[in-house]
Amino acid sequence: MKSFLLLLITCLFSRSAWTQSDVQKRYQTQLILADNGSTVNLDQGTFTFTGSLSLEDKKHIVIRGKGIDKTVLSFKGQTDGAEGLRVSNAEDIIIENLTIQDTKGDGIKTMNVKGITFRNVKVEWTGPPKADNGGYGLYPVQCDNVMIDGCTAIGASDAGIYVGQSRGIVVKNSQAYHNVAGIEIENSRNADVFNNEAYENTGGILVFDLPDLVQKQGGNVRVYNNYVHDNNLPNFAPEGNIVAGVSDGTGLLILAANRVEVFGNRFIRNQSVGTGIISYLITERPITDKGYYPFSSSISIHDNVYERDPGPPTSRGRFGKLFHSVLKFNQDIPHILYDGIADPSTLDKEGNPLPDRRICIRNNKNQSVANLDAGRGFQHVSRDAAPFNCQLDPLKITVGNDR
């Protein structure tokens, strides 16, 4: 009887080891052989991978686990590839109900996909925040019709939830924490970001337009009904990354973006900048892209709530250094900061912005504003909110919110 039990236990352990080592090959084979319109079901359990999984040139595929923290794909010992899962040149793909952990690079990257949905997906780096964590958690780039719903991103050294150079975007009902940037919309058009919680990041939400990218200018971005709080994590991005310049204590940062509407949000205990509106010129990085537009314009910030604990801002990051050495706001930091750098071609003869290119800030609880006059060396910093007391037409964005 004892010999039989020992044999049984040995067989069970051997089977377990075989399954764990074989599962990567099995899942990759399923992805390669999947017929258009099929579902790839992933088992419950924690599985360790040494290389990336990939799906290419497929249509109408569902990749489905058993649930967040029930199907866990761990890449902690990854030696081959960078992403955990990569999807490219595809159409109508759904990824749902799974967790990706500790990838060498990005968690899930989708590129050139028409119709991509992330639903109930978590991507995380399980150790402390550090520069050699992967850059992006969820990373759709150059995609159309992007839906991110009920997802979680933790520990990315760039952005937890990032949508770049894409069109027709919804990011909703999601959480991002312990990242450099919680949620980032970059060089993307027609985006709705709502009902999310971004907290304990360096910066909660970023809306950026950057040079030297295929899609030159984003716009039509709405950020609304989000809870953006306690984003005071020291910046741990690798040196040289654009987000390495984001000051800890940043709630929302709008950089060189146009046609952005921000409303119904709660910006709470972000100790440096509740909302910042800046030009790329303030970064002092060279611009060689002749098609790049480095100014922010047509920005509407209204009906938000701002709160901050008493105390000085951080001294880290570009804004932190400005606060301490140039602006000297001490503990009385305005919640909303505008660098004051405008495109001269958008100003009338009196130097005022044309009606459709204004920065409008109104009806915010605890509202306080400063124009930093950065273009003239911060000579005439103004805390007068009157020039921003205007109203732009609400943005109208048609994206697939019901997917």
Question: For the regions a protein language model found, what residue spans apply to each?
Answer:
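Short, T/G/N/S-enriched strand-turn elements that build extracellular solenoid repeat scaffolds
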Residues: 27-34, 48-57, 63, 74, ...
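N-terminal signal peptide c-region/cleavage motif recognized by signal peptidases
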Residues: 14-16
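Sec-dependent N-terminal signal peptides
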Residues: 4-12
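Acidic, glycine- and Ser/Thr-rich low-complexity intrinsically disordered tracts
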Residues: 283, 289-297, 302-403
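Right-handed parallel beta-helix/beta-spiral solenoid domain characteristic of secreted/periplasmic
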Residues: 20-25, 41, 57-104, 127
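Parallel beta-helix/beta-solenoid
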Residues: 35, 57-59, 68, 85, ...
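Extracellular beta-strand/beta-solenoid scaffold signature
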Residues: 27-28, 50, 76-86, 102-109, ...
